[in-house]
Amino acid sequence: MVKRSQRVEKKAVEVNRGTWTAEEDEKLMNYVSAHGDKKWRMLPAKAGLKRCGKSCRLRWLNYLRPGIKRGNISEDEEDLIIRLHNLLGNRWSIIAGRIPGRTDNEIKNHWNTHLSKRSLTIEDLNKKHNPGIDNIDILPPTKITLTSSSDTFPVTPVCQTDQASDTNKNDVLVDSWTDLSGPDFDLEQFLSLLPMSDLCPGSNGNELEFDDFGIPRHDSKQDSFRSNDYNINYQECLDSQVWSCAFEYDDLDQFLDCQS
């Protein structure tokens, strides 16, 4: 029995290699515009091109598709490539997506040809764009010495109107003490005229105490007693009859009615 080996002879398809011609570019652009950029393996035969599908795809994506920039890469684009490469590394497709109009293949070729030999970092780029920062001289603080008596700090003068108001307030306070036995005596008005230091605890921790009639109690141990501030003697302000009758009544109103 004779065996016959059947050999299927595949006809080799002739494929052009090398630089693309203007005629080939036009054929590829016309076909992609009409049918889209899909099925690159079948595209060359349908478009009448003697190229492989990979060559057609790269030619379209890197050179012929709309939005591609022509010409050399600018200095600003180089700085952006360096910054992105320091952050992302050799991820050329991601870097190309952040630089409009440039392809990943173009950026990779430009990096390997021109930028890989430069050891530039982000700090070097910041100094390049802001050269005036390093030229700023920071002076140390200097001490100011007073050489004469005139070199003194200004002192805020005391307002004369404040002194006059304090004097008038003291006069009204003394008059209130002398009119304690009168019918028009107002205890709340009298207390409002006292300084806050008289109503609050003093520096020695003692408090101002009042008796049943609203009269401050005298404490001989307190050197800063309030009567010394105004030179007031309580027993001299009240006559002996009023002073003796003051302790016979439990109510302040009864005491004032008795004197009227």
UniProtKB/Swiss-Prot annotation:
* Gene Ontology MF terms: DNA binding
Query: Where is this protein found?
Result: Nucleus
GO cellular component term of the entry, any? nucleus
Domain named HTH myb-type: which ranges?
Answer: 12-64, 65-119
Q: Give the InterPro entries listed for this entry.
A: Homeodomain-like_sf (IPR009057), Myb_dom (IPR017930), Myb_TF_plants (IPR015495), SANT/Myb (IPR001005)
List the PROSITE patterns hit by this protein, alphabetically. Answer: HTH_MYB (PS51294)
Q: Which UniProt keywords apply?
A: Activator, DNA-binding, Nucleus, Repeat, Transcription, Transcription regulation
Cite the CDD domains for this sequence. Answer: SANT (cd00167)
Q: Which residues bind DNA?
A: 40-64, 92-115
Q: Any idea what job this protein has?
A: Transcription activator involved in the spatiotemporal regulation of flavonoid biosynthesis specifically in the corms of Montbretia. Activates the promoters of enzymes involved in the biosynthesis of the flavonol myricetin and the flavonol-glycoside montbretin A (MbA). MbA is a potent inhibitor of human pancreatic alpha-amylase and is being developed as drug candidate to treat type-2 diabetes.
* Entry protein name: Transcription factor MYB4
Which organism is the protein's source? Crocosmia x crocosmiiflora (Montbretia)
Gene field: MYB4
